């Protein structure tokens, strides 16, 4: 990999300083070693949120199970899937549904993340009740919106073979699914936060259900890992981009405008949450801007990074 091309102007100096600081702190190695002191001396809500760094091998080991799950659904005549979730449990499935057409081996995928009763009713009316899988996705298992969706669809359908869940080990949702005899319970590793769960069961099961080459996504991500472990910003695009965002915030450019190819514009929804929810915790953050009409350079204020 090579360093991205960028016109940084006044940010050249701050970027160099940010990269030097990260090098001095050995940030890349400490990140991959799950060293919470990179952020804070207090490990709470850090050490139990870094599992995304190691999830790719886990998912590769689950290939047979996921593919068999989808194949059995197709063999049993299923045609549609409704994913129930909020936030990180629904955004990446939404990206998948809006970016990739339903594959020949997949189901017609739609995501329900609205609390509007009319919207939920429309979602049910849009699918054939007898050949639709209802997938409830909640890390905690207690997300009130998702549990409400599940209660509604269960009351309407009531057949356990048409329900499955993705959740963390030991959650109430997992226990409920087993008590009712749901078709499948996918238990994610618990040390992955919702917004970082795209390449875990939370993202890859819906991708597989859509007929997307989910394992290809995992394999391509694995190919990038050696670059992301490098301390050289010319090799590691994640290091370079992270340093650039930090340099921009230091220069009071704290609005990140995302300009995306129309074919992947839905990806901005996931990036928006990832950036917005991952920063700002200590009074300093980045405000992502998505779906904004593109204008000439002079319409963007001095607080923008485009």
Residue spans for each PLM region:
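Glycine-rich phosphate/diphosphate-binding loops that line cofactor/substrate pockets in enzymes
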Residues: 65-79, 122-132, 244-253, 300
